[in-house]
């Protein structure tokens, strides 16, 4: 056999993954005299279970979910709302030529009207690109003014209690019934290329009056210098929730407070003109927005040992215990470990959450830090896989580096603590680090740069449901190991 043939043969063996044990002794011209490489392909088996999703995960996204949905088969229900601050542009201003309506000097025209039109009013606009569920289903939305400031220096999680920031037992500031197919807008508007779905909520006129009075007063004009001053002195924000209805979740991308008012301006000839102006105060990435998500009825999926489940956002997730000692020992080097996770069929329904496109596989004890630091997978302690509709699975082609890291972390700890696996070291290590060999699966969404390359991953908080083969059925991991 010539050198070229030998090289090809070795490469073929190194990348071979099969279900049966195979051992080959390779030598010859590629190794020193007397050295033999033994390559073994094998299968090991991991165990898995369904666990409750961690509430202590940072949501690095501007999307806020609003609505309620009950899954027909399991009865699991998600109810979502959100808290939002409203930003004010630095050095916000209204044209100095604004004088008021009729003979009234600004702001005395607050008591006046222009024909049948209001001189001022305020709307809260909730903009969404899409929603989950029934487009004709109606839900009732309630709005509460925040009574406490959201602390910008504190981390908040999806289990945040809105009652800390406002009196959720009191009568709401306003309530409105809406559906995904916005009946408030004409069909001719919806077909426009620039159309963006929105929910418009009319707020009490007193909010517009308060803002305009504060702006017109020289002593309070500084309230509009920046967002912090605006929130501390005028509007701390709103809590928006679904109080009635079931079957729709809106994916809110932007919340805007619109203050509309009539005024008199003057043209170049100094003639008075009636004007309609609008000031906007935005809820966006520059101010805090927090999802408040609550699940009920997850007990059935948590107890189901015939499979494992992923239900997002923040419902349940799959935990896998990796057989580190079956895959790695001091005698062999682990060259490759392929993990394939196959989906299982679920009952069909008219409105069924989609299968997540991308799953993060990460060491369980690193999950919180990953999202808190706005990270990307390192292919050592975290990996990314996308769903293959052709094969109905997610494939992590090589997690050998993760197995090596788990194995070496334990070895280092045993050495530092003067223990061995044989003298109680294993039990001591597992007591101190019970999740040392555990990973979890979490739906994620990529944050892209200008070249459409992923620069980080954030939690995917859209509605997703995934049933995986596992639980009482072991998960096969195909390995290739070698030794001299």
What are these regions (language model features)?
Residues 2-9, 13, 19-484:
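Secreted, disulfide-rich extracellular signaling modules
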